[in-house]
């Protein structure tokens, strides 16, 4: 595991390859989100914000996240997915589902226990038809360092909540993120 000091972590959060992309469309009380590139800490804040803004719509029945073009996922992204899945489960009429998940990405979810709280379909499943609405909104990838740190902290806390074994893996990450947030908040 890589050990970073608070200042290094902040630099890592701001200087990262920007080949990730999120698009979304809303049609017939369903939201279709497409991820291209890596599911990472960088893409997590806009995904979380977008879903949280939409999830309280009483007419919303489905949120689909198309993972067909997802090249991999980091722990922050998986923690955000777990948190969104748990949030969606508070509304019994709403289904939050990953579609077109590769076996490689499924294995990543299994490693951290996220598969236990997420509903998903693999790329190999026959009833996993591809639907991509014509008009899609490009989600803004902008978020400040504090927001990224907050989302990363909450995501890692969620990973520990769903599987206590994750505390061993992420204890120092959680502590580092908390220290960084305290510093950013002037504490």
Regions found by a protein language model. Give the residues of each.
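Phosphopantetheine-attachment site and its flanking helix in carrier
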Residues: 75-80
């Amino acid at each position: 595991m890589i050990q970073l000091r608070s200042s290094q972590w902040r630099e890592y959060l701001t200087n990262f390859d920007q080949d990730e992309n999120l698009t979304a469309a809303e049609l017939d009380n369903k939201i279709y989100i497409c991820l291209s590139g890596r599911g990472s800490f960088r893409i997590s804040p806009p995904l979380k914000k977008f879903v949280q803004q939409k999830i309280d719509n009483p007419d919303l029945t489905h949120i689909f996240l198309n993972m067909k073009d997802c090249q991999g996922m980091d722990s922050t992204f998986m923690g955000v997915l777990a948190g969104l899945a748990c949030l969606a489960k508070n509304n019994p009429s709403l289904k939050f589902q990953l579609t077109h998940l590769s076996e490689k990405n499924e294995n990543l979810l299994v490693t951290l226990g996220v598969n236990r709280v997420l509903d998903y379909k693999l790329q190999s499943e026959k009833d996993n038809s591809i639907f991509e609405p014509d008009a899609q909104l490009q989600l803004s990838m902008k978020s400040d360092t504090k927001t990224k740190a907050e989302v990363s902290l909450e995501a890692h806390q969620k990973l520990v909540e769903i599987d206590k074994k994750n505390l061993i893996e992420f204890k120092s990450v959680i502590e580092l993120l908390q220290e960084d947030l305290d510093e950013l908040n002037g504490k």
